[in-house]
């Protein structure tokens, strides 16, 4: 959702250093608003010393206290599922997994993983509610509409974007399963 161009998206990823080895993985059909920041593992400091300050950044001999990769906290890859909507000015911390179909409200800070098809808001982001019942969420996770062909998605646009569409799909697929 960048107002200028998607090429500027990389500007939203902070403290990503290849030598650390973490990845930002973003699923299909995500709406990521302007101002979203992905903080990667390179932002983490050692916390086991008296100070957390990274003196090695000074160079000129100060790098003698450069921590090894093993000494730095590593939270893992940051994963954004499919069909996720992330509101404006959200900050996502390292190692967070945001489940398929989730919504993150504007100005939130996500510090823990988010369940699929749920809404989170605040700093730190807290669970607000599920978008659908557990039965419907389970169905949607199995359906994986984002993996359909472009033609199949196009043919089902009205269903995918309507409130009644979920019931229609559940009925359609339950009948299909009963036949098979």
Curated annotation (Swiss-Prot):
One Pfam family cited in the UniProt record for this chain: Hexapep
Protein's UniProt name: Probable macrolide acetyltransferase
Upper taxonomic lineage: Bacteria, Bacillati, Bacillota, Bacilli, Bacillales
Family the entry assigns: Belongs to the transferase hexapeptide repeat family.
PANTHER family listed in its UniProt record: ACETYLTRANSFERASE, ACETYLTRANSFERASE RV3034C-RELATED
EC numbers for this chain: 2.3.1.-
Top-level EC class as recorded in UniProt: transferase
Gene3D superfamilies: Hexapeptide repeat proteins (2.160.10.10)
